[in-house]
Every structure is written in structure tokens, then in C-alpha cells.
């Protein structure tokens, strides 16, 4: 049993060694990669598309800019940003998981998104980019899977250009109590069953439900972003706080 709190972290409801978590999360996403898009639609009843659209609308991305879609998975945001930045801009789709990165690359190439998109396997805690590289960074439903969130936020801050913005789209804490109870029931009882039926992997979706519950609430994440150096941090509750979009700037 690991009992040194400085060397442990959460994997869902489990307490594990920090050195173990990345491999455990990797196993989850290797397992779910092939069914990731289908499961997103089923789990959220398609509403994830609206959450991502709102994120894009809040990004302020313009033609010619450089964007990092971190933990970008199958590339939903990258596809939109690619059109927004145009031929003179650049989008980097980065993910720590090579299975997810492969799915994203294949999906985007199949729909004709080529030319201004690069693919990088990267750990959010140690981004392999120079200081002041990106006009905008988004991380969509990825931060809760990171072992050291504070370190990752500092890494994102470092590679943002002055005037750049970071947007974190993530599951959060419902602000309506009856909804919170219903959401818990759905997450812990229905979601794993859907995962078992569709992806033949109920355990991975049980972890995903648990990881949502262990993720910091809206105000805690706001404070974490401020501690990383971001300014003018604000958040927007979506679907009554089931999801929140946090936005902060580097000045």
C-alpha cells in the first residue's frame, strides 16, 4: 500500500502512486479509442457538440494564429480551428495517448483536414514547445486525467504567447441539487452499462465517471489557473454546471 501523500494521486476513487497513473490512464484510452466518438454521442446525447461549439466561440481564434488542441483526442476542435486559422495559421493536435492520436489523424485526413495541422504526442505536464508559442490553447475533457494538474497548467501558461488565452472545457459540479443526484445515478449506473454494451469495456467508463467526481469544482479550478499565472480567469457553467468552460489569459 502506498501511503506517502506526496507520491500518490487519484485514479478515479483509487489512490495510486503518481508514477502509475499515466500508464493506467493510457490503458483506459487505448481501450476506448476505437469507440470514443460513438460513446461521446451516446453518453452526452450529442450535447458535447454544443459544449465544444461554445468553446470555439469563446476562443477568439483568428486567421493566421497558432493553436494547441491539447488532449485533442479525435480532433473535433482541431477540425474547426483548422478552418479558422486558414493557410497562414497552424493547429497542433497533441495527445499523450498514441491510440487516440492515431484515431484523430485518420479521422481528420478522411474529412480533408490537412496542410495546417500537426500531430504531436505530448505530456501536458512537460509540453515540448518553446516559450510563447501559441495564441490559444484548449484542453477539452482532458485535464481531469492529468496526474499533476498544477504542473500541467504551468506548462500551458509557459507556451502561451503574451495576450494568449487558455480554455479548459471539463466536466464539473452541477449547480442544481436534484440534477446532481440524477447525474450521479446516470454516471455510476447507466454509463458503465453503455460502455459494456457498446465498447465492451464497462470498467473504463466506470473510471471516467469516478474521475469526473474527483475533478476540482469550478472555483477550485479557477484558483488553480490563477496560481499558474493566468489572469482575468472566468468560467461559464454549461448544462447547469454538468460541464464548465474556464478561460484565462497570459499578459
From Swiss-Prot:
It comes from the Bacteria. The gene is ubiE. GO terms for molecular function: 2-methoxy-6-polyprenyl-1,4-benzoquinol methyltransferase activity; demethylmenaquinone methyltransferase activity. One of its GO terms (biological process) is aerobic respiration. It is an enzyme of class 2 (transferase). Its EC number is 2.1.1.163, 2.1.1.201. PROSITE patterns: SAM_MT_UBIE (PS51608), UBIE_1 (PS01183), UBIE_2 (PS01184). Pathway: Quinol/quinone metabolism; menaquinone biosynthesis; menaquinol from 1,4-dihydroxy-2-naphthoate: step 2/2; Cofactor biosynthesis; ubiquinone biosynthesis. PANTHER family: 2-METHOXY-6-POLYPRENYL-1,4-BENZOQUINOL METHYLASE, MITOCHONDRIAL (PTHR43591:SF24), METHYLTRANSFERASE (PTHR43591). S-adenosyl-L-methionine binds at residues 74, 95, 123-124, 140. It holds the Pfam family Ubie_methyltran. Keywords: Menaquinone biosynthesis, Methyltransferase, S-adenosyl-L-methionine, Transferase, Ubiquinone biosynthesis. This is Ubiquinone/menaquinone biosynthesis C-methyltransferase UbiE. It comes from Enterobacter sp. (strain 638).
Amino acid at each position: 500500500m502506498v501511503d506517502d501523500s506526496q507520491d500518490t494521486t487519484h485514479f478515479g476513487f483509487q489512490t495510486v502512486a503518481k508514477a502509475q497513473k499515466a500508464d493506467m490512464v493510457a490503458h483506459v484510452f487505448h481501450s476506448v479509442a476505437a469507440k470514443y466518438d460513438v460513446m461521446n454521442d451516446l453518453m452526452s446525447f450529442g450535447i458535447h457538440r454544443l459544449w465544444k461549439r461554445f468553446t470555439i466561440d469563446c476562443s477568439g481564434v483568428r486567421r493566421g494564429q497558432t493553436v494547441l488542441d491539447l488532449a485533442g483526442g479525435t480532433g473535433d476542435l482541431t477540425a474547426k480551428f483548422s478552418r479558422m486559422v486558414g493557410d497562414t495559421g497552424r493547429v497542433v493536435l497533441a495527445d499523450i495517448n498514441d491510440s487516440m492520436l492515431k484515431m484523430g489523424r485518420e479521422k481528420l485526413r478522411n474529412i480533408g483536414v490537412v496542410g495546417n495541422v500537426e500531430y504531436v504526442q505530448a505530456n501536458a505536464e512537460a509540453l515540448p514547445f518553446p516559450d510563447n508559442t501559441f495564441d490559444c490553447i484548449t484542453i477539452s475533457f482532458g485535464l481531469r486525467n492529468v496526474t499533476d494538474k498544477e504542473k500541467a497548467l504551468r506548462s500551458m501558461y509557459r507556451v502561451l504567447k503574451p495576450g494568449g488565452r487558455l480554455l479548459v472545457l471539463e466536466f464539473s459540479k452541477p449547480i442544481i441539487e436534484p440534477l446532481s443526484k440524477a447525474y450521479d445515478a446516470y454516471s455510476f449506473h447507466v454509463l458503465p452499462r453503455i460502455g459494456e454494451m457498446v465498447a465492451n469495456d464497462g470498467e473504463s467508463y466506470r473510471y471516467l465517471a469516478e474521475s469526473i467526481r474527483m475533478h476540482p469544482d469550478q472555483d477550485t479550478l479557477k484558483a488553480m489557473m490563477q496560481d499558474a499565472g493566468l489572469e482575468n480567469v472566468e468560467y461559464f457553467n454549461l448544462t447547469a454546471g454538468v460541464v464548465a468552460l474556464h478561460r484565462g489569459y497570459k499578459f
